[in-house]
Regions:
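Aromatic-Pro/Gly-enriched surface loop or interdomain linker
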Residues: 1-65, 233-242
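Extracellular ligand-binding/catalytic regions of CAZymes and related secreted enzymes
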Residues: 2-4, 180, 188-242
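Short hydrophobic segments within beta-strands
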Residues: 8-10, 101, 196
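Solvent-exposed loop/turn segments at secondary-structure junctions
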Residues: 14-15, 53, 75-78, 104-109, ...
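Structural motif
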Residues: 67-72, 97, 195
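A glycine-rich, often tryptophan-bearing local segment used as a flexible ligand/cofactor-contacting loop or short
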Residues: 76-143
Length: 242
């Protein structure tokens, strides 16, 4: 029997409690909606964690038993304990997958893994977004057509201050004219990282089948191939030294 991928869906979980418009879309939180969709995939065991939990729900035990961590944050990036970020970073470098969603571009963990400001342009005008699939043979785009559209989104625009992605799989066009690198892949240590742009809280983005298909595909892509601590050993030579 194939082992299921162990996914932890992390959410700040503030907007859904403080903003009625968001609560109407995600009554149990964005993390609950994402979790429900991923559970239907059949090959994933999914749990949630939120900012308000002790250690933000990301204890050593939770992370050691997590294959892929998804991350959504916006209002409280600065409230995330640096010790927890150190812990998450260590696990990513050892092989755990990380999927950062939408405004998580400014999260402590994403900026830590990128080493840049991760700044961008933005505009909230409810405009149309067209996501172009520019890597149709990539595992993350499996089952996705040439493009798909979201009728109402927040605009993100270039320049996006990130390191050059190892692979770019989606480019977004917005009704206002901007474009954006909206699906980006990297490897850091033994771990894989995927940034996926859609997900503004006041629109039902995580109810969209294409969006959730991409996230499910990304979970499979980021599933660890190896989980190994990084050490710096003093080693004996293989061959005899003269």
């Amino acid at each position: 029997m194939t082992k299921k991928i162990r996914v932890t869906v992390w959410n700040e979980f503030i907007h859904e409690k403080n903003n009625k418009a968001v609560k109407d879309i995600y009554p149990d939180g964005m993390h609950a909606t994402i979790t429900k969709a991923l559970k239907t995939e059949g090959d994933m065991d999914v749990r949630t964690a939120t900012l308000e939990e002790p250690e933000h729900g990301l204890t050593e035990a939770v992370l050691k038993s997590t294959d892929v961590l998804t991350w959504w944050g916006h209002m409280a990036h600065d409230k995330v304990d640096d010790k927890i970020i150190d812990r998450v970073q260590k696990n990513v470098l050892e092989g755990m997958g990380l999927i950062c969603l939408h405004s998580a571009h400014f999260s402590k963990i994403f900026r830590r893994m990128m080493g840049t400001t991760c700044s961008l342009k933005w505009r909230e005008a409810g405009e149309r977004e067209r996501l172009w699939n520019i890597a149709p043979s990539h595992p993350i785009t499996e089952g996705i057509g040439e493009y798909f559209e979201l009728p109402h989104t927040e605009m993100y625009g270039e320049r996006f201050d990130i390191p050059e992605p190892d692979q770019l799989v989606f480019i977004s066009w917005f009704q206002g004219g901007e474009v954006f690198r909206s699906g980006c892949c990297w490897e850091r240590g033994h771990g894989r990282i995927f940034y996926f742009r859609p997900g503004h809280e006041t629109y039902p983005i995580y109810h969209d089948k294409n969006v959730m298909k991409v996230i499910a595909n990304a979970v499979r892509w980021a599933n660890p191939r190896i989980r190994q601590e990084h050490v710096c050993p003093n080693t004996k030579p293989i061959e005899k030294l003269s």
